[in-house]
């Protein structure tokens, strides 16, 4: 047959990928159908923050998602990958604030709320566009017409609906409680936004005088209180000891005089106190410490707030009861000397004043963790502020049961324990933030401070019967970003409207996310979804059936990637490549800490001396899938990326060999299939089976390795080579059989690999389509291969394994003895079974061609070969006569190594057989098999030793 056409020598991703993607998108291949009865499959993407661009973690998770989406689309499921971005309140507001400060020298207050928010919308339009273009470059098969943003009108309506309903159910309330307060950004922040930094600090031991003549067991008239935060002592409302601490039991219920403030506070007993810490006596400051806050609630202590929102000492303390309301009748004046002082200035003065009064007992060095706001960059302050809260316990109970009873499964399973530990000890959730960017809280206040909650002001007036002359002002605060994110799976499908999409695609199938947001996002999605979404029988619906938890992508040294470390890798640079100069600019430009630039530049030059070369999207995706071992962090590996680029080239070259082969015969007529044809078909069907099993278990690494192993090690390295003798010497029927098998396996292999490497598989498939006269416009809508058990052929596999081992043995002898491939060798075989003889006769031409043999001769059992190099394949002896080209010393060394290797195997089996535990537990047939193996090794050693002696006498 004449050549079909020409194919480029190498696959060029940059010439193919973007054009292919535009074609896919324009043809609507990513869209689900409107068929409400079709089996559906849906993934909701974790929405990237609109603040910037995608990083390697996004590329990693999105590759896994797209693999599942493409697979399910090929399986015939009505498939939706719901995408969008998150408004990321505090992060986005800070980016834009920094931008206007740098470019215009202005603050948000110079703009005012409305104008500043318009600035953020402009930024969102720019940044969101960048993210969606990057996602296209990754090959993500997303329905872009359904792209959502957490502050879209539809999603905003869902947020208001949830807030109002929860408020009406008594599950949202406003109260004064302790929160993480960022004194620089002037907002409450979540635990996720708090970074605990190791710090060398001090433990101050202060003397608090006992009141009313009381004495300790040692006769002292004071208690020594240990603290790491002297600046909060003006707000102390008790000192606490452990109830079983005998040193202080007699003092429980008595009082001390709080130094500097000169007021009496009680000595209380609480099991929270660690008897071993400091002196076993701690000060309790409920308004400025989370643990003290809980102690205060247990003991009904007043909360004395001594700090402003700037973290300066107040002129007048704010005194709050345990109910969160102002407390009358408790006096806690702040001495004038401290009023207005910044907190750390106040700390120094308080310590100095204790010393001047003779009340500073001692100062000890102390290692501690100081909580910092991860964006404001200053120590956060536990602060009593008015905030909105969700009472989540009732929601958490339902959400916990969903995981307990298996409605939702975590992969890997160990993350369920992390989920349970959080959910079973859940606290009310502070949902308000003192920001401008975000969902404004749907609550209004009249001039008397009464609060009205509704979806908008018009509804407030009708719901509460307020006339137009009643002035109303909306709450200034916005909702925590996680509040709107928690509605993501159903709000993006049109809720609160009962849409067709909601019916078709909810619950979604799997969520792929990082372990660090299991509580902050995953748990809240489960709680909100099960509270608001019910099936037709009124049963709470889960947001997804499986949560697949990924590890982090770290750099090659195992370090977390971060801008400050200068080790961030951009997935687009892996695809397109980047020069060293541009990489240096990217890593050191616009740094928050410019002093690190030189160190980062040096490390970058060392690691990427010539920049990063282009690898294409498929190589990046294949690498990410291959590295995805369950739940573990991943160290990025450029060598693996290069290796998988080579893999893509290998697939391209194999396809080129097939499609441009001048003897490819697709004519009608009888076809005869060779042993190699039957073997590759059997191996391929086992590969399909292994792929499906691995994907079902979310073992993306095994999925990738399965494709790699078959393509490289079986199809390319063996089968393509095995076709050459057929095309050279076979009958027409044999050529037709091999031609059909080549094309059939290649076409199915492209379909098998398509979910992970979509571009190269589509490009080759389009070329193959014409040759094979296939119907269909795109590979992505072709059916995914199913394993056909009828094609499993253990006999062909066994025979082919034997032939391959013989070929490898002969090739190894050539290499070890430095014999040219052009020199045809004689092959002598001894100790061959009747079954193997038949296999040999049927495949003699193939074996001669593949191993480059002049003759193949069978020896009788007792027939001695001429002086030869010997190899063993199973129990078969292989001899290559060495007359004229043996290197005696080299051959003796090789035999010695072979004998030592077998002796090692014998020692291993002897150890096993002398192990009582093994002998007791192992089945009899396993023990018999080990003994049989050992005897085989002993026989082989004897034969090799005879060979050694024969060569030694040369």
From Swiss-Prot:
Assigned EC number: 6.1.1.9
GO molecular function, one term: ATP binding
Coiled coil: 883-954
GO BP of this protein: valyl-tRNA aminoacylation
Catalytic activity: tRNA(Val) + L-valine + ATP = L-valyl-tRNA(Val) + AMP + diphosphate
Subcellular location: Cytoplasm
PANTHER family hit by this protein: VALINE--TRNA LIGASE, CHLOROPLASTIC_MITOCHONDRIAL 2, VALYL-TRNA SYNTHETASES
Family: Belongs to the class-I aminoacyl-tRNA synthetase family. ValS type 1 subfamily.
Record note on quaternary structure: Monomer.
NCBIfam families xrefs: PRK05729.1, valS
Protein task: Catalyzes the attachment of valine to tRNA(Val). As ValRS can inadvertently accommodate and process structurally similar amino acids such as threonine, to avoid such errors, it has a 'posttransfer' editing activity that hydrolyzes mischarged Thr-tRNA(Val) in a tRNA-dependent manner.
Name of this protein: Valine--tRNA ligase
Organism: Histophilus somni (strain 2336) (Haemophilus somnus)
Name of the gene encoding the protein in the UniProt record: valS
């Amino acid at each position: 047959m004449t050549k079909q056409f020409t194919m480029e020598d190498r696959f060029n991703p940059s010439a193919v990928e973007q054009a292919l993607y535009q074609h896919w998108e324009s043809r609507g291949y990513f869209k689900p159908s409107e068929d409400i009865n079709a089996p559906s499959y849906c993934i909701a993407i974790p929405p990237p923050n609109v603040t910037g661009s995608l990083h390697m973690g996004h590329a990693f998770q999105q590759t896994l998602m797209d693999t599942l989406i493409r697979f399910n689309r090929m399986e015939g499921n009505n498939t939706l990958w719901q995408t969008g971005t998150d408004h990321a309140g505090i992060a986005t507001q800070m980016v834009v604030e920094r931008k206007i400060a740098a470019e215009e020298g202005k603050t948000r207050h110079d703009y005012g709320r409305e104008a500043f928010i318009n600035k953020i919308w402009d930024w969102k339009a720019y940044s969101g566009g960048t993210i969606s273009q990057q996602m296209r470059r990754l090959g993500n098969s997303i329905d872009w017409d359904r792209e959502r943003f957490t502050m879209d009108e539809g999603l905003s309506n869902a947020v208001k609906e949830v807030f109002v309903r929860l408020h009406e159910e008594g599950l949202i309330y406003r109260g004064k409680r302790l929160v993480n307060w960022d004194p620089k950004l002037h907002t409450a922040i979540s635990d996720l936004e708090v970074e605990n930094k190791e710090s060398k600090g001090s433990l101050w031991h202060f003397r608090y005088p006992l009141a009313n003549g009381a004495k300790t067991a040692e006769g002292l008239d004071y208690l020594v209180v240990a603290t790491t935060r002297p600046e909060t002592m003006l707000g102390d409302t008790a000192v606490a000891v452990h109830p079983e601490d005998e040193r202080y039991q007699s003092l429980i219920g008595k009082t001390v005089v709080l130094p500097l403030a000169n007021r009496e506070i009680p000595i209380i007993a609480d099991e929270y106190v660690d008897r071993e810490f400091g002196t076993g006596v701690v000060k309790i400051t409920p308004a400025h410490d989370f643990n003290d806050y809980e102690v205060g609630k247990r003991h009904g202590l007043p909360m004395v707030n001594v700090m402003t929102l700037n973290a300066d000492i107040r002129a007048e303390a704010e005194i709050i009861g345990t109910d969160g309301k102002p407390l009358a009748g408790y006096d806690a004046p702040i001495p004038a000397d401290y009023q207005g002082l910044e907190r750390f200035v106040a700390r120094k003065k308080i310590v100095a004043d204790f010393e001047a009064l003779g009340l500073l007992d001692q100062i000890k060095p102390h290692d501690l963790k100081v909580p910092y706001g991860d964006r404001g960059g200053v120590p956060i302050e536990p602060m009593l502020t008015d905030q909105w809260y969700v009472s989540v316990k009732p929601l958490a109970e339902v959400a916990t049961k969903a995981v307990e009873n298996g409605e939702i499964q975590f992969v890997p399973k160990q993350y369920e324990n992390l989920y349970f530990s959080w959910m079973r000890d859940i606290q009310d959730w502070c949902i308000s933030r003192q920001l401008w960017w975000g969902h404004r809280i749907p609550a209004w206040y009249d001039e008397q401070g009464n609060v009205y909650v509704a979806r908008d002001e018009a509804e407030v007036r009708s719901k509460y019967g307020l006339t137009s002359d009643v002035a109303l002002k909306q709450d200034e605060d916005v909702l925590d970003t996680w509040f709107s994110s928690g509605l993501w799976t159903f709000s993006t499908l049109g809720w609160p409207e009962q849409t067709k999409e909601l019916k078709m695609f909810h619950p979604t199938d799997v969520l792929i996310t990082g372990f660090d947001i299991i509580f902050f996002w995953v748990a809240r999605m489960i709680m909100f979804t099960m509270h608001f979404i019910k099936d037709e029988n009124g049963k709470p619906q889960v947001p997804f059936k499986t949560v697949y938890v990924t590890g982090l992508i770290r750099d090659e040294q195992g370090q977390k990637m971060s801008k400050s470390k200068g080790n961030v890798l951009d997935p687009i640079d892996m695809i397109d490549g980047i020069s060293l100069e541009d990489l240096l600019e990217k890593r050191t430009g616009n740094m928050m800490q410019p002093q690190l630039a030189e160190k980062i530049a040096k490390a970058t030059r060392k690691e990427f001396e010539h920049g990063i070369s282009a690898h294409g999207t498929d190589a990046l995706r294949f690498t990410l899938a291959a590295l995805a071992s369950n739940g573990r962090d991943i160290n990025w590996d450029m060598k693996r990326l290069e290796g998988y680029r080579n893999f893509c080239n290998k697939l391209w070259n194999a396809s080129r060999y097939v499609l441009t082969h001048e003897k490819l015969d697709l004519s009608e007529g009888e076809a005869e299939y060779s042993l190699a044809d039957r073997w590759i078909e059997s191996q391929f069907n086992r590969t399909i089976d292994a792929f499906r099993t691995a994907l079902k278990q979310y073992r993306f690494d095994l999925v990738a390795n399965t494709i790699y192993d078959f393509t490289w090690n079986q199809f390319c390295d063996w089968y393509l080579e095995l076709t050459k003798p057929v095309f050279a010497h076979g009958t027409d029927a044999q050529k037709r059989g091999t031609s059909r098998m080549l094309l059939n396996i290649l076409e199915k292999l492209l379909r098998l690999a398509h979910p992970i490497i979509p571009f190269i598989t589509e490009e080759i498939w389009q070329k193959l389509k014409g040759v094979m006269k296939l119907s269909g416009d795109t590979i992505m809508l072709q059916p995914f291969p199913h394993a056909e058990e009828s094609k499993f052929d253990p006999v062909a596999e066994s025979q082919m394994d034997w032939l391959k081992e013989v070929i490898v043995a002969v090739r190894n002898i050539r290499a070890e003895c430095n014999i040219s491939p052009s020199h045809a060798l004689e092959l002598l075989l001894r100790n061959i079974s009747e079954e193997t003889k038949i296999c040999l006769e049927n495949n003699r031409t193939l074996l001669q061609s593949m191993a480059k043999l002049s003759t193949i001769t069978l020896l009788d059992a007792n027939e001695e070969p001429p002086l030869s190099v010997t190899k063993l394949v199973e129990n078969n002896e292989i001899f290559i006569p060495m007359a004229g080209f043996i290197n005696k010393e080299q051959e003796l060394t090789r035999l010695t190594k072979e004998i030592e290797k077998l002796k090692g195997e014998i020692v291993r089996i002897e150890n096993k057989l002398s192990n009582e535990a093994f002998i007791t537990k192992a089945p009899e047939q396993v023990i018999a098999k080990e003994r049989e193996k050992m005897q085989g090794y002993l026989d082989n050693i004897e034969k090799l030793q005879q060979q050694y002696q024969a060569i030694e006498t040369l």
